[in-house]
């Protein structure tokens, strides 16, 4: 399932110059202004948003909570203070990156969503390549699986019939639309 129709999605722009985006349970997607500015075009931004929605539709946060609950149950059997384990679980959820499998799954879901909505799917791996080739890669990429491997996987997933799409790649139109905000 690429889209969960039972969820009301909420998108928030965070005034932060760091290049980052993240999703939480309940359909909340947060995109930093730094990421919006770093994108060359609408399709690149759509790729990031599609990836974050992929985490929601993949129920990745729910899996992390289930794992924490299992760990808490095991700790009770071992006589560890449950309050201490809950605190550790919250800290782990906030600081550890999504699993490698979750990232690949969110990439696949995001790329598929891009193709279904008409955006040029090439923008997703191109944005990742742009970010890792910059002066300093964004912090969120350093906590994700090997980006070069993800780029290669994304490029392989794009069907030949979609490789020449240009929808959403107009950089000047994108930058013009941002002028009133930034």
Which residues does each predicted region cover?
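A Zn2+-metalloprotease active-site environment signal
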Residues: 1-182
């Amino acid at each position: 399932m690429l889209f969960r129709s039972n969820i009301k999605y909420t998108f928030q722009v965070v005034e932060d110059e760091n290049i980052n985006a993240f999703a939480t349970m309940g359909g909340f997607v947060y995109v930093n202004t730094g990421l919006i500015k770093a994108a060359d075009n609408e399709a690149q931004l759509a790729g990031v948003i599609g990836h974050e929605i992929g985490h929601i539709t993949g129920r990745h946060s729910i899996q992390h909570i289930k794992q924490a609950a299992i760990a808490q149950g095991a700790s009770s059997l071992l006589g560890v203070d449950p309050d201490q384990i809950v605190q550790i679980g919250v800290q782990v959820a906030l600081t550890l990156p999504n699993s490698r499998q979750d990232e690949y799954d969110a990439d696949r879901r995001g790329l598929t969503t891009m193709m279904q909505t008409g955006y040029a799917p090439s923008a997703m791996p191109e944005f990742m390549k742009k970010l890792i080739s910059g002066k300093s890669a964004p912090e969120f990429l350093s906590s994700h699986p090997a980006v070069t491997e993800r780029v290669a996987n994304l490029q392989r997933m794009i069907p030949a019939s979609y490789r020449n799409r240009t929808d959403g790649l107009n950089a000047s139109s994108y930058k013009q639309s941002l002028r009133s905000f930034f």
